[in-house]
């Protein structure tokens, strides 16, 4: 039934808005196979389905990124996208205003929740990772892609990790990126809609040839510590979030990569 609910939400969205206009890319399985297919199997990127599982069973697909939305926390539990050289071409787009995401049927957080809160509207998929087109760049300013972040965290250690991710995407000929806040435990909230403020943020990267994977778990606080000090196993992030990352990887590869904590395979 969870799969049917996801398909229903996507169909309802398409009936309300133009899928083409809002960049929703949906592949709906044969009705007889709905109970056999997981939400992450519904949309395939190239020949590798890199989407995680969803604890909310509410997943949306845009042209530039996909996300699992948590209405309880008024933000996405994960945002997933592919990052290659072409996505980072030099551009000088004007920054749009932050807006609610029209494809979220329950309505994503109103940007006014952040006003005078002391928190930045922190991107999960950075605008700098979506410079390929103005349309994809603008998508990153929907609040479905935003989480509350301390300014010195957003502009500090988190920004350093985003820049390093771009470096690796170039060095290793592309990456799959999954990122979000850990929406578990006791958290502060802001605004009338009580947007949760994560205590930790995570970022998981895997090379497109599936030979390297790395996970970062970063406390939501200012830090000048080297990025490698935040490296953890993907297994640890799975335990904290309840999310299964890369479930479509061959089991022996998934188990080996997700248990690794060594950062020496990556150029820091």
Question: Can you say where each PLM-predicted feature lies in the sequence?
Answer:
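A boundary/linker detector
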Residues: 2-3, 20
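Domain-level detector for secreted/extracellular nuclease and nuclease-toxin modules, and
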Residues: 17-268
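Sec-dependent N-terminal signal peptides
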Residues: 4-14
